[in-house]
A protein has these predicted regions:
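Surface-exposed, low-hydrophobicity interaction/linker segments
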Residues: 1-2
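Terminal interaction modules at protein C-ends
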Residues: 62-286
């Protein structure tokens, strides 16, 4: 019967073992009659099958490039090393879905993707040097947008949902933010200043402006965490925990002082990123 799926608009086929009856769902009543006639002509007794009209065909489960997941290099359809982290999902002005990560992840690569899929050639990505961010459009293999950080291999069994994003003028001084990255996994820091400028070592001298400066201790961000989500955990009492997106990780500087060692992390603001890339942040529950 598998060769006739399209001919008879078959949605599903199953067996009720108790009654030894084959259950078939098709999309239209006309196809139901045609299939019934076909089965009877092949010698099947009418009591041996049950045909149901179901106009809705099952749809494949969506594949997501989730915030906090690893960004990989791809060459000729072969996955390479993981070099950065997804910050958030977005949609561009042409209606194309994709994810945002650090612009400097593009410097020496030709294709970027996730574990399962090569998403885009770098030439198809939209980049903003002044916010160290880039939009990587999805290929046809990824079918859904998501605001859910859900990677048990990196962040344990806790899931987080990006439900909103901060405005560029939000006063976050003194606020504790949580970062997600493929190397350090999860780290926290306190915002020291809400508008700083800096240039990336090894870059082209472009000045990144109006970024958050965050002081981290204990576990600190490291290589590969670039582009990753930085957010305020809004409600840890619910599942998934809700969070407000502040920006993505761009760079770090290590300091040693008499009071101890610490790291400053620099976080371009989400609103500046979406404006520069002309994309819309997606926060949702998938």
């Amino acid at each position: 019967m598998s060769n006739n799926n399209d001919k008879y608009a078959i949605n599903t086929v199953g067996i009720t073992q108790k009654d030894n009856v084959v259950n078939v769902s098709v999309s239209t009543s006309e196809k139901a009659e045609e299939l019934s006639d076909e089965l009877i002509s092949k010698g099947f007794e009418k009591k041996s099958f049950d045909i149901i009209v179901d106009e809705m065909r099952p749809t494949p489960a969506a594949t997501y490039a989730r915030p906090g997941d690893r960004v990989y290099t791809w060459t000729g359809g072969t996955r390479g090393s993981h070099i950065a982290t997804i910050g958030f999902n977005a949609k561009n002005s042409s209606g194309k879905n994709g994810f945002v990560t650090a612009e400097h992840a593009l410097w020496y690569e030709k294709n970027l993707g996730i574990y399962e899929y090569d998403c885009s050639s770098v030439s198809n990505c939209t980049a903003s040097k002044s916010t160290d961010s880039c939009f990587v459009p999805f290929n046809s293999g990824i079918t859904g947008l998501t605001g859910l950080i859900n990677n048990s291999g990196l962040y344990g069994n806790t899931t987080y949902k990006l439900t909103a994003s901060y405005n560029a003028s939000a006063d976050l001084e003194g606020v504790t933010l949580t970062g997600f990255g493929k190397t350090s996994k999860k780290y926290t820091g306190v915002v020291l200043r809400t508008s700083v400028s800096y240039s990336l070592t090894g870059g082209d001298g472009t000045l990144i402006t109006d970024a958050l400066e965050m002081k981290t201790a204990y576990k600190k961000p490291a290589g590969g965490d670039s582009g990753g989500t930085v957010a305020k955990i809004k409600d840890a009492s619910v599942t998934p925990q809700t969070a407000i997106l502040a920006g993505i990780l761009s760079a770090t500087s290590d300091y040693t002082s008499t009071s101890g060692n610490y790291t400053l992390a620099y976080v371009p603001k989400v609103k500046n990123i979406t404006t520069a890339l002309n994309v819309t942040f997606y926060g949702g529950s998938n």
